[in-house]
C-alpha cells in the first residue's frame, strides 16, 4: 500500500471522538476502535496487522518517535501531540498517550 500525500486539509477531531489502538511490541496494530477507523479513513483490513506508522505524517520529526520508543520500552507512559495523516491525505492532530500493555502497547488519542 502506498502512503498518501498530504492534501493540506486539516480534519478536526471532536473532543468526544476518543479513539485507541493496541499494538504488539514492534508497533504492529492488533486492535482498534471504530472511531480510529473513521478518523484515519483506513479500513479495518488496512489497519489491523499494519505498522502503527501507517498514519505517520511526514512533518512529524523522527526524534519525537525516538523519544516515545525510548520511554515506553522502559515501562513508562509517553504523552505528546502528534500530527497524523489519514488515508485520504488529510491531517489530524491528537494528544496521544501510549502506555505498556502486556507484551505490547495501548495508545489512546484525544483532542
Question: What is each PLM-predicted segment?
Answer:
Residues 2-111:
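Sensory/regulatory domains in signal-transduction proteins
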Amino acid at each position: 500500500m502506498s502512503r498518501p500525500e498530504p492534501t493540506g486539509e486539516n480534519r478536526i477531531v471532536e473532543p468526544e471522538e476518543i479513539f485507541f489502538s493496541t499494538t504488539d511490541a514492534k508497533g504492529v496494530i492488533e486492535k482498534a476502535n471504530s472511531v480510529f477507523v473513521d478518523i484515519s479513513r483506513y479500513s479495518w483490513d488496512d489497519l489491523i496487522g499494519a505498522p502503527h506508522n501507517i498514519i505517520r505524517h511526514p512533518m512529524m520529526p523522527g526524534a519525537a518517535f525516538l523519544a516515545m520508543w525510548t520511554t515506553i520500552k522502559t515501562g513508562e507512559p509517553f504523552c505528546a501531540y502528534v500530527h497524523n495523516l489519514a488515508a485520504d491525505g488529510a491531517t489530524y492532530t491528537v494528544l496521544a498517550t501510549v502506555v505498556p500493555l502486556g507484551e505490547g502497547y495501548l495508545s489512546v488519542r484525544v483532542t
